[in-house]
């Protein structure tokens, strides 16, 4: 999710005609993809579930079953934790490994992802419904950059000496926490896998990770690459299964020292409660959002319209960062709405494997129904439906790009996270007013402001109650920058140097010495 726009080679232009003429330059999906990895991955081995249960995985573009996956449960979780604890034990290969070698393993994993980039992008597209070109150019690029970024950090994490009073020599060590439980969502399955494991492994931890039950395929494929890269057995263990069973077992397991979760605020609360009730494990939560995107009259209007469009419709609107509350200054409101509607009507919805497609299906029937219900609530509560608002086609879970105007702050569509292709456009008059309204939310993940006035930009960005603020851009996420939320959008930070702090403990060591000299 390094950019809200799919960045293609320079020879390939964005307009459909040029795109069609340049198809030979684009990567191609893997035809007749064979799903080889459908079992649980523990101790670098593929295992059946202890219960013998399996669950189906579907293609959201067609509603058809792709395959069946072994369903992990509490017993399998216990096995994975034992493997992770053994791999983390004092004197183990992993604990004795030089930090530089950990970095080399992460770099090797990045090499293997690059080698299999088309396969992984095909798998992401097939399993999650996102356009193949987005998966290839955005998601996979983010995976590779994240792995390489933390590979570079592995031998640069260190403590310091401290000039304490008295005849003592004091220094600090940054040590791995231990076994890390990680639970990832279905909207960016592979990218979130990398966001979670890369800093954890960089610091020397071991991992038990649960992919979303809707999208386990790419995570399981990564298990094979992790083994091929040379990570010791037990360092990474992958448990496909369901949140109330495996997710709950991870959150409450006393053998897990830290948990990281990306998903809904509702589930995040349950995880934090379970972590507290069990062994008070450390918790990092990246949760929901209802992000404000503020457009001032002095902004470049065409650019702001396109960025706002991508900011909410990217990845079928299934982004925690989606800029779904768009506040537009009154003097340009009507024109902004007109151009936004024109752009939404041009958005190409279709097969994820069609290179002209901008928007694929929603992830499943449950999410599809939730989005349509919230769209109906917007109509009922008096917002103006400018375009879209309905499902598309007989197969799959496609929804028309939808734009609402005349939205007010008290409407459900302005307060609740829709997680779908629905743009809500509100109007404002003054800077102070829009700051107060933008901050009047339980969430605080990201915010954005579009203006050519640096004073407005800095005033608004400093006032926003959000972990990330973008000025004249949107979805500008990078491996080097910390990411996380204020308020009910979570706690802790992922990515950047800050992400390392979530996976290490600082130990102070003090030695009595005969005499200290400066």
UniProtKB/Swiss-Prot annotation:
Q: Which reaction does it catalyse?
A: retinal + NAD(+) + H2O = retinoate + NADH + 2 H(+); all-trans-retinal + NAD(+) + H2O = all-trans-retinoate + NADH + 2 H(+); all-trans-13,14-dihydroretinal + NAD(+) + H2O = all-trans-13,14-dihydroretinoate + NADH + 2 H(+)
According to its UniProt entry, the protein's GO biological process terms are: heart looping; heart morphogenesis; positive regulation of gene expression; protein homotetramerization; response to retinoic acid; retinoic acid biosynthetic process; retinoic acid metabolic process; retinol metabolic process
Residues in the active site?
Answer: 286 (proton acceptor), 320 (nucleophile)
Pathway this chain belongs to: Cofactor metabolism; retinol metabolism
Q: Which residues make up the binding site for NAD(+)?
A: 184-186, 210-213, 264-266, 366-370, 417
Keyword annotations:
Cytoplasm, Lipid metabolism, NAD, Oxidoreductase
Under the cellular component aspect of Gene Ontology, which terms does the record hold?
cytoplasm
The record's EC number reads: 1.2.1.36
Mention any Pfam family matching this sequence: Aldedh
Q: What is its main location?
A: cytoplasm
Q: Where in the cell is it found?
A: Cytoplasm
MF terms (GO), sorted A to Z: aldehyde dehydrogenase (NAD+) activity; all-trans-retinol dehydrogenase (NAD+) activity; retinal dehydrogenase activity
Q: Indicate the annotated site residue(s) for Transition state stabilizer.
A: 187
Question: Which enzyme class, named as a word?
Answer: oxidoreductase
Report the function annotation for this chain. Catalyzes the NAD-dependent oxidation of aldehyde substrates, such as all-trans-retinal and all-trans-13,14-dihydroretinal, to their corresponding carboxylic acids, all-trans-retinoate and all-trans-13,14-dihydroretinoate, respectively. Retinoate signaling is critical for the transcriptional control of many genes, for instance it is crucial for initiation of meiosis in both male and female. Recognizes retinal as substrate, both in its free form and when bound to cellular retinol-binding protein. Lacks activity with benzaldehyde, acetaldehyde and octanal.
The record's note on quaternary structure and interaction partners says: Homotetramer.
Q: Which family does it belong to?
A: Belongs to the aldehyde dehydrogenase family.
| Protein's recorded name | Retinal dehydrogenase 2
